[in-house]
Amino acid sequence: MKLRNLLSAACVALFTSTPLFAGDVMVMDAYARVASKVAKSGAAFMMLHNHSDQDDRLISAASDVAKRVELHTHIEEDGVMKMTKLKDGMIISAGGMHALKRGGDHVMFMGLTRSLEHGDMFELTLTFEHAGDVTLTVAVDLERQ
């Protein structure tokens, strides 16, 4: 394995394994993907754990890697899966967990301002209704299924 690939893998492992807190909400295992080097869009996935005794809501996300950053999900409509914007955000139940995963809820990056390659890292700010803002470093992991 080349040294660059080894270092990239180590950085991805380090940054995706370190949990961060926004108030009582813990963000874990964050990573991003793009379909190809020339993709105009990408997505981020992670696990959110609400340690408080009240529901919270992820209401927005922001990053300089894209012109627009939105909260999205997939829905089935007439037998066809479609991606749609979540206008009201994502609820994280009190004491519960919420997975942002492929084929489900996720952070969508549209109009990428730069290419995202395996091992790259960028900042993403998540805004929660009660817990406030948390800025995390997200690693691009194109090998993850």
Model-identified regions with their sequence ranges:
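Compact, glycine-rich, soluble single-domain proteins
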Residues: G23-Q145
